[in-house]
Amino acid sequence: MKGQKYYSDYHVWIEPIHSRIVKLGLSSQMREHLGNILHIDLPSVGSFIKEGEELCILESSKSAIEVLSPVSGEVLEVNTALEDDILPVNNATESEGWFVVLQLTEDFRSESFSLEP
């Protein structure tokens, strides 16, 4: 399970780190649909995000969208490097372009997600 990416209906990938800790980012398919990402508003460390609610806001060359979280949990880490340099979201969406690390409210259940974007 560790190192494997799962994809949600919200076009967010989920990479389990431990049973209740996951890394989240935007699927490359959605990034291509949005065009060039220009800015991102990320949540604060310590904030709580509920499944189906705002994970972050992305501004692209085509529009601004609210990215929804596929899971509920507390934000443990934020990729603050993206605030100064958004290029990883555009060029390495599924690696250096990750958004946050969450501590989930319950164990991650991979069967709720797809292995394909």
UniProtKB/Swiss-Prot annotation:
Cofactor dependence is on: (R)-lipoate
As to how many cofactors bind and how, the note says:
Binds 1 lipoyl cofactor covalently.
Which InterPro entries has this protein been placed in? 2-oxoA_DH_lipoyl-BS, Biotin_lipoyl, GCV_H, GCV_H/Fam206, GcvH_Chlamydia, Single_hybrid_motif
Keyword check for Ribonucleoprotein: no
For this protein, the record's Pfam families field holds: GCV_H
* Domain called Lipoyl-binding: residue spans: 21-103
Query: One GO BP annotation here?
Result: glycine decarboxylation via glycine cleavage system
What are the record keywords, sorted? Answer: Lipoyl
What cellular component terms from Gene Ontology apply here? cytosol; glycine cleavage complex
Q: Please list the coiled coil stretches.
A: none
Give residues where N6-lipoyllysine occurs.
K62
What does the sequence similarity comment in the record state about its family?
Answer: Belongs to the GcvH family.
Q: Indicate what this protein is called per its UniProt record.
A: Glycine cleavage system H-like protein
Organism listed in the record: Chlamydia trachomatis serovar L2 (strain ATCC VR-902B / DSM 19102 / 434/Bu)
